[in-house]
Amino acid sequence: MILQNFVVLEGGDGTGTSTQLQILQKRLSGEGGVPTYLRQGAKGGDLNTAWHIPGEGAFPQQARLPTTHFTFEPTDGPIGRLIRQALHRSPALHPTTIAHLFAADRHEHLYGESGIAERCQRGELVICDRYVPSSLVYQGLSCGDDTPAFLNSRFPYPELILFFELDPEIAEQRYRKRDTQDMFEHLAFQKRVHEAYERILPAYCAHGTTLVRIDASLSIEEVAEQVWRALQNLPIFKG
């Protein structure tokens, strides 16, 4: 089943999905915000986003800006917080346990009170940083394809997936600037992630999801424009 009005941002680590979600949140607020970017050197070039709010007509306003909810997975709910702790704990939880936790977090995210499904069905746009494809890729690489495929088989397909494409070596360079250490860090793993995405995404197209590939090697501004153009093709913007 396709869940209309549901948009998902997907890509390997370091491809910029979280940054673009923040940009969309400001742009769809209806304030006419135009992003400017400040690079802070304290942590080796971490990117922080600042916003300049100019006067009327700074960029073309849409005839209709839909009510939009921005979210991410794992969520900041109880199960999502447990996942974040588990990914950084020692000893690590069994990979199959992690896969079950992601599926439980996603079920609540979709069907809990004021969840994704409820919002989409009442005509709101929901934009989510990561969804089922991330589980099929990451948990598939850690515990095999069968378990995450089964756990996520009943969840709806999004109307649109924006896949952020980036050479794994460039993505790894970006990711290392965060100065973090976790199980998803190494370049060889990132190459496997990229290959796994290429393997699973065609199935979404076969089920009716629109897939738009975003060139994440471009500047943040150029990537943001690609994302914005893709969103404008959704029926909810033309209603």
Language-model region placement:
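Conserved lysine of the Walker
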Residues: 17
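Hydrophobic anchor at the beta1->P-loop junction of P-loop NTPases
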Residues: 9
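A glycine- and Lys/Arg-enriched "phosphate-lid" helix/loop adjacent to the NTP-binding pocket
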Residues: 130-196
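NTP-dependent small-molecule kinase module
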Residues: 1-2, 22-27, 31, 37, ...
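Extreme N-terminal, non-catalytic leader segments
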Residues: 1-6, 37-47
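P-loop (Walker A) phosphate-binding loop of NTP-binding proteins
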Residues: 12
